[in-house]
Amino acid sequence: MKIAIAQLNPTIGDLSGNAKQILEAAQKASQEGVRLMLTPELSLCGYPPRDLLLKPDFVAAIATKLEELAQQLPTEIAVLVGTVELNPYATSKGQKSLFNSMALIDEGKVRQIFYKRLLPTYDVFDEDRYFEPGDRANTFWLSSLTIGVTICEDLWNDDGFWGKRSYEINPIEDLA
């Protein structure tokens, strides 16, 4: 399977401009025979969107733009798009209202949504303020292959490399 990594420069809050970048990258990748294209974390809304995430209209606009993008992307290529997703359990379980997510778009539809599991809260990062962590391994099936999805920090909890773990769970181990 041919996979492409879209090197994009999303602008925080520019949903239309960011969607255009994703679409153009997917069109080019599709012409080159790519089956799966990856985009950066929160590529649709830009990273870090910070308090824009507290505006319900902005979050709704992200969902709308994601659906529009799904219909515009070439159908020959699957695309993992960095986005946010509403947490349906936020009020009933006292959880955060959003997930930092990757949406799998294939054949004109959002097929699956995957949630970031490890949320950084050190240095300039404050993801725990806005997001609920995912609670399960993220995998999907494409072209007869099982593919695992991690989002940024999910990769960085390797005690073999760092000499210690920063988080209790290791999403990479859960994929194995």
Where are these regions (language model features)?
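Enzyme catalytic cores with a strong preference for nitrogen-chemistry domains
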Residues: 1-176
